[in-house]
């Protein structure tokens, strides 16, 4: 009779080992939750971070316009923290997927800006895994799923400027550079080419970001100003607070009454749940609209155009603010990629 003792023990040992590993990955008691999405997130974010830092410091100049005039973005090539950036992939690459094995060598890959695609794609998928990990952790704790829904706003905004816009424009060289001055350059060129300031979805995004900041400051100041005193007058309010206590720490009715009389009654919330839903939804929806706007402008469905739209009874043009902005747009348009342009045909 065949002896199956050792085989059975091996299966049991393997099962025990993988059971331990899976239990560790999915444990909600760990100081840092990992989860199934964490298996994807941690290496992707780590690779993107290491590659970004290395490229920001050491990467050689990149032929961003595809005309053999490389642009330097690394610190070792004379840049500082403000002017430095990871330069987008070359216009010669277009929207082709450009991993290192597609180049003739590592030097060519660097020259054509392969690091930009490497950092961006690892970051996008890593951030997507982070969002999935937020849902997974909330699910295991029995929480509602709205945390990952809120995080979807910055994720879709990142996808819009790093992935959708380059695809719509036909080249990753049109993506947003990974640096401070590069970001501002991207914004100016975007305005010049798409008139984003006159796009309704951008206006909604501005309202979402600035409105969210205003509402957050208002909420924080109201809560801090209406804390319930559990101590004597000569002691700090913090002394009477215990972390995790079930009792309320501030009086929402007092805050509601104050703000309702400061503005008007219906400008204030008397329900904590509706208040915090509003605080979350306002900026998230605004940023969703901005991402949608950038994604539509990626395919040249641009902002509204009111240039030369006002004339007097004699048919003479009366310049408006739209015409002034248009003149600024023309100036920015001819200044960027100036060696790749054939002025003035580029403005036709």
Curated annotation (Swiss-Prot):
One of its GO terms (biological process) is response to herbicide. Keywords: Calcium, Chlorophyll, Chloroplast, Chromophore, Electron transport, Herbicide resistance, Iron, Magnesium, Manganese, Membrane, Metal-binding, Oxidoreductase, Photosynthesis, Photosystem II, Plastid, Thylakoid, Transmembrane, Transmembrane helix, Transport. GO terms for cellular component: chloroplast thylakoid membrane; photosystem II. Chlorophyll a ChlzD1 binds at residue 122. InterPro entries: D1/D2, Photo_II_D1/D2_sf, Photo_RC_L/M, Photo_RC_L/M_CS, PSII_D1. The D1/D2 heterodimer binds P680, chlorophylls that are the primary electron donor of PSII, and subsequent electron acceptors. It shares a non-heme iron and each subunit binds pheophytin, quinone, additional chlorophylls, carotenoids and lipids. D1 provides most of the ligands for the Mn4-Ca-O5 cluster of the oxygen-evolving complex (OEC). There is also a Cl(-1) ion associated with D1 and D2, which is required for oxygen evolution. The PSII complex binds additional chlorophylls, carotenoids and specific lipids. Pheophytin a binds at residue 130. Fe cation binds at residues 219, 276. Chlorophyll a PD1 binds at residue 202. The chain crosses the membrane at residues 33-50, 122-137, 146-160, 201-222, 278-292. Its EC number is 1.10.3.9. Its main location: plastid. Tyr-165 forms a radical intermediate that is referred to as redox-active TyrZ, YZ or Y-Z. It comes from the Eukaryota. It is a multi-pass membrane protein. Pfam families: Photo_RC. A quinone binds at residues 219, 268-269. The record marks 194 as: Stabilizes free radical intermediate. It is found in: Plastid, Chloroplast thylakoid membrane. It catalyses: 2 a plastoquinone + 4 hnu + 2 H2O = 2 a plastoquinol + O2. It is an enzyme of class 1 (oxidoreductase). PSII is composed of 1 copy each of membrane proteins PsbA, PsbB, PsbC, PsbD, PsbE, PsbF, PsbH, PsbI, PsbJ, PsbK, PsbL, PsbM, PsbT, PsbX, PsbY, PsbZ, Psb30/Ycf12, at least 3 peripheral proteins of the oxygen-evolving complex and a large number of cofactors. It forms dimeric complexes. Belongs to the reaction center PufL/M/PsbA/D family. Photosystem II (PSII) is a light-driven water:plastoquinone oxidoreductase that uses light energy to abstract electrons from H(2)O, generating O(2) and a proton gradient subsequently used for ATP formation. It consists of a core antenna complex that captures photons, and an electron transfer chain that converts photonic excitation into a charge separation. The D1/D2 (PsbA/PsbD) reaction center heterodimer binds P680, the primary electron donor of PSII as well as several subsequent electron acceptors. 2 of the reaction center chlorophylls (ChlD1 and ChlD2) are entirely coordinated by water. Herbicides such as atrazine, BNT, diuron or ioxynil bind in the Q(B) binding site and block subsequent electron transfer. This is Photosystem II protein D1. It comes from Heterocapsa rotundata (Dinoflagellate).
